[in-house]
Swiss-Prot record:
Family: Belongs to the ATPase inhibitor family.
Recorded consequence of changing residue 41 to Q/E: No loss of inhibitory activity
Misc: Present with 981 molecules/cell in log phase SD medium.
UniProt transit peptide range: 1-22
Superkingdom to which the source organism belongs: Eukaryota
InterPro entries in the cross-refs: ATPase_inhibitor_mt (IPR007648)
Protein name: F(1)-ATPase inhibitor IF(1), mitochondrial
Any one GO CC term of the record: mitochondrion
Subcellular locations according to the entry: Mitochondrion
Organism: Saccharomyces cerevisiae (strain ATCC 204508 / S288c)
Quaternary assembly: Monomer and homodimer. The protein aggregates less strongly with increasing pH.
GO molecular function: ATPase inhibitor activity; enzyme inhibitor activity; molecular function inhibitor activity
Main localization of the protein described in the UniProt heading: mitochondrion
A Pfam family recorded for this sequence: IATP
Length: 85
């Protein structure tokens, strides 16, 4: 069984926002906090781009679902209105 703190952290990460994890460099070894070479910058930019594209896709999908639900609600309201007349 997981401790409460671990369970709470796992539940927080399961929300709709993707957590961003960056690689430390080409060799996988930890680097100093101040060293940023071109590979790390390029990799971070690529990962950021991928995350933004994924979030755009999710947002588009949610908007489509919302539009379908709005149409369904409008249809049901029209049906109710026609029955009450």
């Amino acid at each position: 069984m997981l401790p409460r703190s671990a369970l709470a952290r796992s539940l927080q990460l399961q929300r709709g926002v993707a957590a961003r994890f960056y690689s430390e460099g080409s060799t996988g070894t930890p680097r100093g906090s101040g060293s940023e070479d071109s590979f790390v910058k390029r990799e971070r930019a690529t990962e950021d781009f991928f995350v933004r594209q994924r979030e755009k896709e999710q947002l588009r999908h949610l908007k489509e679902q919302l539009e379908k639900q709005r149409k369904k609600i409008d249809s049901l309201e029209n049906k109710i209105d026609s029955m009450t007349k």
